[in-house]
Amino acid sequence: MRRMLVIRWILAIHLIATQVFAERIKDIATLAGVRVNQLVGYGLVVGLSGTGDKTGTKFTEDSFANMLTQLGINVPPGVRLNSKNIAAVMVTANLSSFMKKGQTMDVNISSIGDSKSLLGGTLLLTPLKGADGRVYAMSQGNVVVSGISASGSDGSSVTVNIPSGGRIPNGATIEADIPNPFYYSNSLTYNLHTPDFTTAKRMSDAINELMGPGTAKAIDAGSVVVTAPKKLSQRVDYVSVLENIEFKPGEAMAKIIINARTGTVVISSNVIVKSAAVSHGNLVVSITETPVISQPNAFASGRTVATQQSQVNIQQKNNRAFILPKGTTLKDIVRGINAVGATPADVISILEALQQAGALSATLIVI
């Protein structure tokens, strides 16, 4: 009995250890075609309290005149519409792959003219188009603005946040479905967030182990193709099983990411350094210039001359060095660099020098 209990504990520990390093397919890959689609449209916001586009904004006037014409109101030629209660805006929205006709989604409103504020405005019916030029949604509603702007008669003004932009919650109604290969394709393709040959191979092996040989095939470092059921009713259950399969991804390539502007340095866990010695020291050079006035004696024939007297001081702090033995890891690198009191800028210089010396087994990326 005791022996069986020990065996169970060993199996449980092994299972936990395996799960710790395993990741689900849904966390490291996305199904091709299942994505967000951007929509955009041009419209008019009305009902503004004198904070709309100024007189002379031609595209706003033309849009307003065209809208009135479509509503059966004729605008005489040459007549300028000088209403300051109207603003031309761009309307944007994100349409998910599986949203259907009749559902609603949020939209963002952004002024493109010189409107000061969209507070209190109403967006008139605006078609939203996709990249293919088709209309997928219609938007209309009251604009919610979080910013505010106020000005005084003396020209002073105060602006909080951005009053020239806003949102309309559930302000667009979907009128057409997005074409999706999930419904008609004979196979499903998973695209890895971070392409890696080892990860793609292990992912296909994990799927084949559970779903049967030949079900999945890694076609390159970034994609795995999986055979899909022909019946659409079975695909949801099938994908639900696939995306929860756990496996151990391949180890990431050794990289060092450096942000030269902020001094941020990110080092992956696989970075290894060959034998090298690093010396860290600073030269402080100070140059002081003092103006010196040369005044001639009284009644002399000379003239006053101003010259610069320069004094150069060079101070060198105590050089400190540390040795990186072969096979040094991330922990040793950080400890060694910190030991010499290096600043982020010094760390960047040290890492670049190590790579130039051929002692750094990693890809150095400066952003």
UniProtKB/Swiss-Prot annotation:
Q: Name one Pfam family in it.
A: FlgI
Position of the signal peptide: 1-22
A GO cellular component entry from the record: outer membrane-bounded periplasmic space
Chief localisation class? periplasm
**Listed InterPro entries:** Flag_FlgI (IPR001782)
> What GO terms are given for molecular function?
structural molecule activity
**Alphabetized UniProt keyword annotations:** Bacterial flagellum, Periplasm, Signal
Q: What does this protein do?
A: Assembles around the rod to form the L-ring and probably protects the motor/basal body from shearing forces during rotation.
Regarding protein family, the annotation reads: Belongs to the FlgI family.
Name of the molecule in the record? Flagellar P-ring protein
What is the originating organism of this protein?
Answer: Legionella pneumophila (strain Lens)
What gene, per UniProt, encodes this protein? Answer: flgI
